[in-house]
Amino acid sequence: MLPELGFFLLLLATASAFFLALVPQFGLFKKNPTLINAAWPLSYIFTLATTLSIGLLAYSFAVDDFTLEYVAAHSNSQLPTFFKVAATWGGHEGSMLFWLFSLSLWLAAFAFFNRKNDRTFSAQSLSLLGLICFGFAVFILFYSNPFGRIFPAPAEGRDLNPMLQDVGLIFHPPLLYVGYVGFAVNFAMSLSALIYNQSARQIARSMRGWVLVSWLFLTIGIVLGAWWAYYELGWGGWWFWDPVENASLMPWLLGLALLHSLMATEKQGVFSYWTTLFSLLAFAFSVLGTFIVRSGALTSVHAFALDNTRGYVLLLIFFVLTALAFGLFALRAGSSSESAVKFQFISKSGGILLLNILLTIATVSTFLGTFYPMLFQAMNWGSISVGSPYFNSIFFPIITAILILMVIVLSIRKGQFDRTLLIRCGWLLIPSLILAGLMIWQQLRNNSALHFHAFAFVLLTLAIWLLFVTLWQNWRQIRLSQFGMILAHCGVAIVTIGAVMSGYFGSEIGVRLAPQQSQTLGQYEFHYRQFSNEIGPNFTAEVAFFDVTKNGKPYAEIIPERRYYDVRTMTMSEVGLDGGFWGDLYIVMGDSLGKGEFTFRLHYKPLIRWLWAGGILMAFGALFSVFGLRRKQEK
């Protein structure tokens, strides 16, 4: 009975979204305040119905209701409870319902925080959000219904994909979804501004907070996903340029460009067209990312639920939204009432312009690298893969230029270069070069198999330089309004340092070891002490115990595993990891060779944790910027 109630609530949500899309529009056309104001209760009804619907689905997982086909396909009675709840969004149907639930939260938040603002503009935006909600609700009802019954019900479920049975995957997809769909708010606001022929400057400040929060969630989601890929997939890396990874990167890059463009638009009235364009593109690429994950058109280690028909419906939604949005943008672009604003190239705004160009190039390059294989195959030209060499060759000069640009912009005051600041920034380059050289030399000294990389040295030097200049420029007087920017820019530098050191100067070796055998990697010796078999809640495990010494002194115990999941008949490696400030030791357990002998891959990843720290620092930068913006609005 409860699943039927969940389906009824989904129907109610669809109906409320339909009326939200139509009633305020009719009220705006007739200038009827009652119909205009109906946007608010309809928004809350949609949110309540969606929340209760996904809550009932989660409850069905918790109580092992295998009469639901979706629950039977993605859960098992032996699965720990918190993984049962996480399985709610572990497959296609549940993840789309969670997508809609996330959208409903943004809808309710926008309605609540704009209940006292311009009712006409807010109602128009809510109506457009209602249209988006209606489109996805209909898609779920007809193509992705998670409440379908199965008779006779199986005695046991198929279990959750073992790759998803991880704490990181409980939070990673929801954070990404919240970040993705948050861009729907600025999408609706920009369309409303186009409908009323307003410039982006008129809504820039109110829009910036929504973009900051969306970008904040997307940043945390990407960082958490990279961390999960690092310790769960067992290949020693953290970013594979996988299509699904790229699907989250593209709206992240566009959101970053939008944030900077909004600042220039708000303060100086420049880049209004850029701001509107980035606002529309950020959400459009979020929908495109959903297509990538769910269509099966692109092969991905993340695309666990594949269905071409569903994917093509999502692609249709993408084309309809983009056609309407950019058609309106094209119509209004030439008729905007915005007056011309004097623009100085040597200024903060000039730096933002160059940054936006670089971020646009990065997004377009990522898009081409992601979709070119699909186009190649669609044209019957065969199959082709685009991997890390392509993306690295594109992103190295872009990141280099961005790091240099960030330092140069810090030397601009009142529309011109400050000679004193330039000289001092130049002096800080010297210790940056020395420190970068020492960091690389230390790794080369510890492992003679490593080689010097000029590209890595350049990036490392620039990242350290940016960190030094940012801290030096602001250490005497840190204003709350700029504290978020300082944190975010320091985060960029720290992420770059972690990526360069772990990517270029990490060590790894593949070996076969039996108990009581050892292997040396750099200054570490890995001693395989013993082997045991263990039983988990829904798996059996082969466990190896390693004692690690550093320069002859006891350092750590590391315990990798190989788990066999009986229901799914899948074997997964659980990485053994010892992490620290200066680097991680990382063991991946491979195939069994009998009598406790296995193949292993041993890794040392210097400064890998700086990646996660830098990403979290960027997220905190966005959070403090939200607080700073809120204080300004209260004044």
Curated annotation (Swiss-Prot):
GO terms for biological process: cytochrome complex assembly. The chain crosses the membrane at residues 6-26, 38-58, 93-113, 128-148, 167-187, 209-229, 239-259, 273-293, 311-331, 351-371, 390-410, 421-441, 452-472, 483-503, 570-590, 607-627. The keyword Transmembrane applies. PANTHER family: CYTOCHROME C ASSEMBLY PROTEIN-RELATED, CYTOCHROME C-TYPE BIOGENESIS PROTEIN CCMF. One of its GO terms (molecular function) is heme binding. NCBIfam families: cyt_nit_nrfE, nrfE, PRK10369.1. Keywords: Cell inner membrane, Cell membrane, Cytochrome c-type biogenesis, Membrane, Transmembrane, Transmembrane helix. Required for the biogenesis of c-type cytochromes. Possible subunit of a heme lyase. It is a multi-pass membrane protein. The keyword Ion transport does not apply. Coiled coil: none annotated. Its main location: membrane. This is Cytochrome c-type biogenesis protein NrfE. Belongs to the CcmF/CycK/Ccl1/NrfE/CcsA family. Disulfide bonds: none annotated. It comes from Haemophilus influenzae (strain ATCC 51907 / DSM 11121 / KW20 / Rd). It is found in: Cell inner membrane. InterPro entries: CcmF_C (IPR032523), Cyt_c_assembly (IPR002541), Cyt_c_biogenesis (IPR003567), Cyt_c_biogenesis_CcmF (IPR003568), Cyt_c_biogenesis_NrfE (IPR003570), CytC_NO3Rdtase_biogenesis_NrfE (IPR017563). One of its GO terms (cellular component) is plasma membrane.
